[in-house]
Every structure is written in C-alpha cells, then in structure tokens.
C-alpha cells in the first residue's frame, strides 16, 4: 500500500511541477519560448470558445489561469490536500480538453497532450 501511495505522491508532484511550468510560460517566455508562444496565441481562442460568458479580457483570463495553476500546484504539493488537488486537476483538465477540442486547430496535438495529463492524473487517483 505504501508503494501505491508513493507512486500517487510522485505523480502528484509531477503534476505540481507541470503547473509551475505553466505559470512560468504564462508570465515569461524566457525558459520555454515555444510553449509560451503557444499559450499566448491560443488564449484569445479559448476566451472565445469557452470563457465567453465571463466577459473578461485576454489579459485577465491569463492571470486567472496563472492563479488556477498556482492554487492547483499548491493543493498537489501539500500532502493533506493532495487527494482534493487530484480531483480538481481532473475537473480542470476536462474543461481544458473541452476547450481545445472546440478550437479544432492542431486538435491531435492538443488531444494527445491532454490524454497524457489525464492519464497521469487518473493513475494518481486510482492508486491512491
């Protein structure tokens, strides 16, 4: 049982690091120029595709994503909140997947990246 818990914790830390990577990519292109550029070019499309009802600017949506990534990364990093963080991650990944599939541009790349993240998250939940 402890091995399964250790695996789940390791996967949760991996997801927390990915959230930190996303924060960095949203705020600066210094360390990941291609990922930053992809996020910046896709953000207005996501705003129109799924977040139109919020009525926020692209810049506001970017900082909302940064806040979500920071909160989720914190939930995943704290042992007492990790189970909750994994469930929140699963829900947010489903929203992101839905948004990417509505865009229909480079859908295979977006599908595969979300499939990998969903697989990691579901594996961490399953072995927990």
From Swiss-Prot:
One of its GO terms (molecular function) is isomerase activity. Keywords: Isomerase, Membrane, Signal, Transmembrane, Transmembrane helix, Virulence. It comes from the Eukaryota. One of its GO terms (cellular component) is membrane. It is an enzyme of class 5 (isomerase). The chain crosses the membrane at residues 61-81, 107-127. Pathway: Mycotoxin biosynthesis. Its main location: membrane. Residues 1-36 form the signal peptide. It is found in: Membrane. Its EC number is 5.-.-.-. The keyword Isomerase applies. The keyword Iron does not apply. It is a multi-pass membrane protein. Belongs to the cyclic ether formation enzyme xenC family. Cyclic ether formation enzyme; part of the gene cluster that mediates the biosynthesis of GKK1032, fungal natural products containing a macrocyclic para-cyclophane connected to a decahydrofluorene ring system that show potent antitumor activities. Within the pathway, gkaZ functions synergistically with gkaB and gkaX to form the cyclophane. The pathway begins with the PKS-NRPS gkaA which, with the help of the trans-enoyl reductase gkaC, synthesizes the polyketide-tyrosyl acyl thioester product which can be reductively off-loaded by the terminal reductase (R) domain in gkaA. This is Cyclic ether formation enzyme gkaZ.
């Amino acid at each position: 049982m402890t091995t399964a818990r250790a695996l789940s914790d390791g996967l949760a830390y991996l997801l927390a690091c990915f959230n930190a990577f996303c924060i960095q990519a949203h705020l600066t292109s210094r360390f990941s120029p291609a990922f930053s550029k992809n996020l910046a070019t896709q953000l207005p499309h996501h705003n129109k595709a799924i977040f139109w009802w919020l009525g926020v600017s692209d810049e506001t949506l970017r900082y909302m994503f940064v806040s979500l990534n920071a909160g989720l990364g914190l939930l995943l990093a704290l042992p007492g909140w990790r189970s909750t963080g994994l469930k929140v991650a699963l829900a947010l990944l489903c929203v992101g997947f839905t948004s990417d599939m509505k865009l229909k541009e480079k859908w295979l790349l977006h599908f595969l990246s979300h499939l990998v993240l969903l697989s990691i998250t579901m594996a961490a939940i399953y072995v927990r």
